[in-house]
Amino acid sequence: MTMAYTNSNLVVYTKLSPNHSGARTHSIDRITPHCVVGQCTAEGLGDWFAKSSTQASSNYGIDKDGRVGLYVEEKNRSWCSSSNANDQRAVTIDTYL
């Protein structure tokens, strides 16, 4: 079965990161939340993930005002949880403290 990937229609800001592994090797069957410490904006996280030196990313981020940013399209594996096996099958979402 081939999975059709879509990106959330809740996204209000997009800045695609170079930090990903390309096409997934597993269909999406989980969500992985990840915490970003600090009061970031969707744009600020996009700027951080846009740096190749960061070597991190997520599919989405939800900022301090509840705005959703897209950083790695769902069809691609982000570099979020430090687990290839997890990130291949998860939509990863950074949230803010």
Model-derived segments and spans:
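Active-site-adjacent loop/helix surface patches within enzyme catalytic domains
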Residues: 2-97
